Amino acid sequence: MKIINLGILAHVDAGKTTLTESLLYTSGAIAEPGSVDKGTTRTDTMNLERQRGITIQTAVTSFQWEDVKVNIIDTPGHMDFLAEVYRSLSVLDGAVLLVSAKDGIQAQTRILFHALQTMKIPTIFFINKIDQEGIDLPMVYQEMKAKLSSEIIVKQKVGQHPHINVTDNDDMEQWDAVIMGNDELLEKYMSGKPFKMSELEQEENRRFQNGTLFPVYHGSAKNNLGIRQLIEVIASKFYSSTPEGQSELCGQVFKIEYSEKRRRFVYVRIYSGTLHLRDVIKISEKEKIKITEMCVPTNGELYSSDTACSGDIVILPNDVLQLNSILGNEMLLPQRKFIENPLPMLQTTIAVKKSEQREILLGALTEISDGDPLLKYYVDTTTHEIILSFLGNVQMEVICAILEEKYHVEAEIKEPTVIYMERPLRKAEYTIHIEVPPNPFWASVGLSIEPLPIGSGVQYESRVSLGYLNQSFQNAVMEGVLYGCEQGLYGWKVTDCKICFEYGLYYSPVSTPADFRLLSPIVLEQALKKAGTELLEPYLHFEIYAPQEYLSRAYHDAPRYCADIVSTQVKNDEVILKGEIPARCIQEYRNDLTYFTNGQGVCLTELKGYQPAIGKFICQPRRPNSRIDKVRHMFHKLA
């Protein structure tokens, strides 16, 4: 049986969830389609999802059409969850991108299409809601060519009499994009030679599989119009990305979720081989797991199974596997399946409104962050505050909704701040000697620090031989240095530097590793004071698509948001701007873009890295440490 993993993507309210229900119903997987309005759909399981008509977390369902099984990965539609969209896309064999016949190409549609092109995923366009009044399909096609891709092939005609209907498009004009993209076919066309239909279809299929040609189909998901034709196309056009002739197992985890009873489940895409119940599977050089229970999606439901075949999705109860964990032979994993997630750029504190719910909150955050690589948290050991780091403000709104709905916890979140870093300005050394006041520790430590190029991270080297200072003391120095790097002169993490352990001395038998561990961060701080530090802040690459009249406004606003526009291009009455901007400014820049373009502007961003901060220095309160703070202050007075 052929297995296809299909993604359905759309802008908010284009009908994505309704289309999923219609596909399940038309294929016979379910007896009655669910309704977004009534909250009875199978994929949007959260109240927030149903209330907004958007998808926040990936859901999996399936149907069968003749000898083809289709797993539907109902991917998130909100752009604050682009990282989860990419993670979902990584398991897909193909995608259906919805376009609302009434609303046309929205900013969100373009961002999703950009993601599909980035991942080179074969994509079908489905123009939904064609039964609404005032629809101008030629205008929609024109907009698709201008804002998405000129390489579209309209596969159907839409008729109005005696009632609205869709039929195959047999006009020769539909093949223009196919002919113009192939030199051999174009030469035949220019010389007036006849075409074989098989030639055109073969070239269409080749380019479709390469993700460079996009067939267009039509319908109404709400009224099941054109859905059967869409199912037939899905079953015939998409191929599984599973390598042929491979019997060895290879699978990858793409989703983690917890049940209401706090049971942990991992979703795995099988790329090759077959997974059997009671198999013992290698997940690392030293670690193996035994498969004791497994489920697969079948006809709209999840069923227990003894096997999961190549190409399928399998759900395993497991406490060991992590996101992107690989089961079996990782050499068989398709290259584009390796997805890097951006680092969280914002941080804040979160607290419960009722103190007795604190432990519940901590457990909930552990589960949520387990399945979301863009969310991290820790508890300050002194203030006991819960610190969250994350990517976007809407992400926080959704987390609060999950906490309230799933865990019944009411939380308060402070205004977030950007996560800065510190980098030494120059090379410096500092040594604190044993028995020299105010050093209370039975240890001498000398450190040197020097800046490295931005993006290098922290490098540590010991230049003290193990014959002179044993391993336990050496390890303690490194641990103390790494602890000291957590807070620089302004309270931010220290990065992009090389730290060398230059000198160490101990007294036997009174010296202990703790003496070196506690002294090292104090020595590091003094070295940083001599070197000085600069603040680094996260920067983003941005790419803006907007009506041409927005150009002057963009240049006018750029200095206000510290944005640097590096290139400008005008295409089809649209301006394309590329540049860089501090992450702290992007939300306001986006808000202005939306306001001044009446929602037509699109802003694509990705993390560029850290650069020297512009403007005033932002300090973060230092986390107290009762064991070393008194000594720190003594050395501070000496400086």
From Swiss-Prot:
Belongs to the TRAFAC class translation factor GTPase superfamily. Classic translation factor GTPase family. TetM/TetO subfamily. GTP binds at residues 10-17, 74-78, 128-131. It comes from Streptococcus pneumoniae. Residues 1-244 form the tr-type G domain. The keyword Cell division does not apply. This is Tetracycline resistance protein TetO. GO terms for biological process: response to antibiotic; ribosome disassembly; translation. GO terms for molecular function: GTP binding; GTPase activity. Abolishes the inhibitory effect of tetracyclin on protein synthesis by a non-covalent modification of the ribosomes. Keywords: Antibiotic resistance, GTP-binding, Nucleotide-binding, Protein biosynthesis. Pfam families: EF-G_D2 (PF22042), EFG_C (PF00679), EFG_III (PF14492), EFG_IV (PF03764), GTP_EFTU (PF00009). The gene is tetO.
